[in-house]
Amino acid sequence: MTTDVQFSSQEIELFRVKEFLIANNPAKINNENKDAVLTQIEHDFRYLIQYIKDGLPNLNESTRLIFPDTFSICLLRSHQIIASKKIDSQEFLSAVKEQLLTEANANIIFEYVLDFWADGGAPLMNALRDLFSKLLNLLKITYPMSTLKDVLFNWMNEILEVPSTLRVQYYLIDALSSDFDLYYIIEKKPHFIDNSFSLMNSDLLANSVGKCIVSLLLNIYEKHFKKNESFVQEWIQLWKSCALKYIHDKQYTKSINLYIMIPLFKNMPNSAFTLFLECMSNKDPSLLLSLLKIGQELGIEEEPFCDNKYTTVDSVNKLIEQDEYKLQVFEILTFSTKKSKPIRPFVFKTIKQYLYVFFVDTELERRNYFCSSMKHFIFRTRDCAYSLARDARKLKKAEKFPDEQREKLAQVEEARAFLVWLCNFIKYNLAPGTLYQANVTSLKLMHILIKSGVDKSTPQKFLDNQNKREYPFSIPILQDVTFLRLLIDLLVSNYADVRELSKEMLFIMISADESRGLFLDTLDANALKWTATSLLSDYEKGDAGATVYEFIFTVMGSQRSFIDQTIDILAQMVQNLQNDSIGCAENSIGPHFAALSLILNKFNSEENHQDTSKIISKLINLVLKSWEATRNVVCHDSAHGILPEKYANCGVPDQVIISHAFRAIKEASYLLETILKKYPLTRDQLDSIGDLFIVQLSTIRHSGAFQAVLPGLKAFCIRCQLEFPAILEELLSKSVKSLKSKTQHITRRSGGLPFLVTTVLSAEVTKGRPLLQKTFENLLLVARLPIPPHQDEFDLPQVNAINCINAIFVEPKLSVHCTSFVSEALELALLNFDCDIWALRNCSIMLFTSLQNRIFGKVGRSVSAKLFFTKYSGLRQLLLNILNSSIAQYSGSERKSYQIESIFLVLNVLLRLRPTAGYTGLKEFNVSVYECLSNENWKIRDMASRVLHMLSENFEEEIRKLLDLASIAKQNQLHGHLLALQQLVPQYLSGTRDMELIQRILEKKRMLLLENKCFITKKAYLKLTCCILETCDIPDSILKDYISTLRNTFIAENNEYVVDGSKQLYLAQILDMLLKYEDSIYLDDICLLGLYSPFYEAQLSTLQYMNTNFHWETTRNSEFLEQLQLLLRVPDLLPMAKALVVKILSRKKNTLSLTTCTDLLKTNNSEDTKLAAVSSLSAKLSSQTFHQVWNLLQGFFADSCSKDFRLASLECLTAYPESCKNSRILLQLYNFLWDDDSEIREKASFYLNKNFIQTADWEYNRNTSVTALIFTKKFVDVFTSSEVVEELCLQLFQYLNEYDMFAAEESAKNCLFTIEKDNQFINELQKAMHILNMIKLTGRDISKCYKDQIHHLKSALLEHFNTEDFKDSPLGWCSNAEIFSRITLLKELIQHYSPSDYENFINVLTKHSVHPLIISYSQL
């Protein structure tokens, strides 16, 4: 590759034409230069037309784009000249009409657009679309429509013959839709609209198809029906059934609404929308809601839920209870095109009633969509309140309509009350122990409320400046101490986004003048700092500690001293690690670096300019010292262990030492990133940072650590690009030189060098990317260096260069700039396929894979062979040479495994190419592909069979050729041919019923099944015949003859047991076919043969069939029962088979005894077998066995049990007919509503809604939280006995007492990760409140033992307060979710069951500053 780009003569001429056309805008043409310019444009027009006529010679990647762009400009200039009033263009117009744009030439251009669109990428398609648009414009100004109509009509006919999966068809129809009546399309192609709708689930086609359908239908309404509204109904009938057919499918709904319904109804009379709604035969809620939303947005239906116009308020409530519809309902309920329009009271009421269903949503996309909708509603509420208050003031000032004034002010108060309620609701969902999704949603809504200006103390910079309006009231969010406590508590959340959102809210709070002083008086900075320090010393909580540190720094007055103290602590830690690398291996250096990084982001360097340089200097030195202290751990490279020998038996686990070291490097890199982005640095400091990155990327032995270094490296490169670009060139120069170094101990992917090269190159902003060009050339030079004899195979510079080239193509920021290098890189990869050195082959294969993904895209996609080999000239011969060479060498005496790799990779390329009509370049590969079909490697034969299928143009001819060559004397060849036939035959027979060929294949059964001794090729033949039977209807006589042969073969082979896996699979295949195609009267015999078979694969196939198809009504059930019970007792029966036996036996009443099930569960059986046993227990449930079965199942209800067992136990309960009458079972099903797994929650909810709550069938899938709430009321209506109250109390007090609130918290030693609860979904406090509410609703008192427990716990709590001289604070004792929920529950219990103690209890809580939300907590 040379630095001077070489252009072909065509490219040079196209560039000249393009530059000339751009330079000669008609506005610049005058009488003096007119003749010369117009003559030249005519000449260029002729040249461009002739270029198409000549077949576009020397077409390459560049020319493919330059040509249509140039021609578009030519057509545009021609149109501008003819349309110009300043130029006499009659002579030019005549030339265009008679010589340049004749009908024949217009057709040539059209054909060019049509041909090249199919295989073009997005840039080419855009260029061709522009070209066609300019062509149409020029034709319309050149010819009258009466003349042009025939040409366009012929084009339309040709367009309609284009495959429907190509976008060009839809674009061209859309482009022609304004020129004539397109109703004839429906007449000519009656299924066109239906076929078009069927493609609306394709992301690639939806936009183009949608525009086409809209243009077509609008054209028909305007030109065929003459915009006559009386024909709207008839117009709807043309497409209604097609729309309704697909719009119900979720894959289609969104795209049909977006690309068809909205633009269609937007351009039609409102009556069209109304009539479409009325003629809907199926009132599907989802469809109705989506259409009502469209009507709202278009201003056709403003408030569709009002006055029961389309549905009742009760139906709206039921719809919002279901996850499938809740977002649509909420959006319609809260949306208005007139934002200041008063909000109806039922809207506020419905939102209050059902807002919680959005806060428990586990789907991120739905939560984000809800937050967006809620934002619009909050701002609408603000605008509405503002408008109402303004109008009330005007009326008051005018002293008019006092009743209307009161009504408007009442509506303002209603809005204020709703927002106050919303703030309280948010508080409850920020409480310790609430779900992650509730936390995130609450924080986002809190942010929206603050941005909307609901608190007038909010600083201006935090308000939303779009459509600014002021509330006529203020809600003091920023001065609320409960919000302050909740937000500080969330700073230690395990979730980074929760910490960030909380931190953002706190920053707004302390920025407000009215709240800053209040909070500083409230907060105990020293206690917070102690907590933060404690968190920083804990590896798993280090990020939380760093976040708290940042918060303390933000509220502290003396920021410089705080930074100095933190630096001193960190410096001491680093020094200690250097002095005692074992004793201090667990020092929290990483978290302290993280804390400093966050602090520096908030540090005001401009106000502390003199101190900043000293701080930065200290920090850079600390980073360098930390690296020196940890490098012996992360750079250790030895076969004797992952750590240096001195760490052996040191008492600290290796993983802990490594994790602390890597984290120190990662957090130090983030600190450097902060410094590089924000603070001034000298050239020397930049050099030292750059040297550090080079050393780290060159010596670290762990790929994860490379990723840790990258943030800092990226910031470094961007900084250098702005200030010292020469540093980057030096870095690249050093990197390329280091490729050849033998002291690197490079890993097989070249360590951190590719990261270094790509990161530096990504920072380049110079036009043309000269640094990328130069680096790529240098890398290619290194990669192409000849390898001397006896070269070290593990330290090749060529390997490192190829890995760097691969990294460049993979890096998203660089890949777009590498198009011109693809051909050379592909050639480089291919040339090394058959290299002797594994490392070089391996890196070349990785490069090839990256390039293949770039060229072909997703797996399964293919490109035209002609286009591919035209685009990458020279590759066809290279691929052919490699394939032939590898086959020849592999067939010789010295066989090497890498030759198999070469064959496989070339075949993989061929598999992605599809034949092009008239192109013969693939035919030379056929001979080699046939040779590959005989290769001794199974994978090569398999790949070759699929390639042959892709290359074949005449399937019938290929099939007959393969059959003719089939012989059992050559088993590899036979196998390859059978695999190829498996690919070719089904596709051929799908288009024709060639019975002669089918009979010919089936007649080979004697040779291939009876005479053949190889079970692998026998099985391949069976699979081929199976494909035929699945594809075609075979005459009964032929089918019976073939199945009879299979039956006899199975009986004969099944009697002779040998240890042979291929025979096992072969017999299983025969058995599968017999069970599928054998006459039903023989099926019992076949199944029994399979069960008695000594081959486990045959047994397994039989059991799998019986599991789904066998019924115990058979007359031979005793034989089956005997054999299945016998199998159950076989000690070494396959676990999978044993599980199937249990499932089949469980379907026969009284076959599996309770004792047998118990034994299966208690003995050492597989999980599948135990699951089958659990599922079968439902049949054993009765009033007599309930306690025994219940005790067995209880072990599987727990959250600690696997999901499969919990699900099996749920299904066992729901299969029991009496479950909906048994209070204990119903309570367990209620518990399943809080399960960690959504499938279990939904199944429990479905059962309860259907069988216990007994709702309408379309309500069975309501939200599980709604079901839980409804259940609590329904349950106590049905069950009110003292036994039920006892069961509820048992659950409630078990939860209350299972956690010891007063025990000292223990931290796990050497713990690197937070130990999560088994159930991440349950809100334990909310569930406890549900149970307490059920107890209250029964109207029964609780027993004395439970009241004693309440008294005892209350006394213990008060004693703890007094003994410990207790005072709670943010991040304090009550911030623990377990403690918070239990004190809150205790408060509720005291209030209800010991009311005389309640006031004193609250006073004590208040005195000790207990979490304010505990005191104010009540059920919404």
From Swiss-Prot:
Primary location: cytoplasm
Gene Ontology CC annotations of this record: cytoplasm
Superkingdom classification of source: Eukaryota
Disruption phenotype: Loss of methylation of the 2'-O-ribose of cytidine at position 32 of tRNA(Phe). Increases occurrence of 1-methylguanosine residue at position 37 tRNA anticodon loop of tRNA(Phe), indicative of a loss of wybutosine at this position. Simultaneous knockout of RTT10/TRM734 leads to activation of the general control amino acid (GAAC) response and severely decreases cell population growth.
Family per similarity comment: Belongs to the THADA family.
Extra remark: Present with 7110 molecules/cell in log phase SD medium.
Assembly, per entry: Interacts with TRM7; for 2'-O-methylation of position 32 in substrate tRNAs.
Name of the molecule in the record: tRNA (32-2'-O)-methyltransferase regulator TRM732
Gene: TRM732
